[in-house]
Amino acid sequence: METMTVNDREYQVRRLLGKGKGGYSYLVSDGKQEYVLKQIHHEPCDYYQFGDKLQSELRDYQHLMNLGVPMPRLLEADLRQERILKEYIPGDTIYTLVQREQVTEDHFRQMEELCRRLYPADTNIDYFPTNFVVSGGVLYYVDYECNPYQQAWDFETWGIRYWSKTPEFLEYEALHR
């Protein structure tokens, strides 16, 4: 089994959870508990410009925590290896729930509440449905990325297009099977 370290502590890699603009997220275990280990990558992204990705993640995490965004706790950062260890929140992603046609009004209500915290703070997050996990009835934002608010990228203008089986969602799904 493959292992990865964070600040010299070893974790067994269970599986790849996903790849985003900034890194790869793995489900890992120390033998007692499961975590998410995010490895920052430096692959080009033609639609997004980054500075220091790790520092951005750490800064964004603090900003979103201050706003009360439900998220996994940041447990550790390994600056040398550009890795972040996060709390693992088990549950289905909104993406999976869209596929099953199980997104509920309560999920949308929780997103509206979240937007009421974000927008007055001049903040957008990445509303793509793979970035949200439902656990114990709570909607968690499992990414730490945030950006200055722009209406073109807010939930009502952009994000909602991927929270049901819209043409945009179906096109994305067809391209990523």
Name each model feature, range by range.
Residues 120-124, 135-177:
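C-lobe/activation-segment region of protein kinase-like
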Residues 127-132:
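Hydrophobic residue at the +6 position relative to the catalytic HRD Asp in the kinase catalytic loop
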Residues 35, 70, 84, 140-142:
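Protein kinase-like catalytic core scaffold
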Residues 49-67:
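The N-lobe alphaC helix and its flanking beta3-alphaC-beta4 segment of protein kinase-like domains
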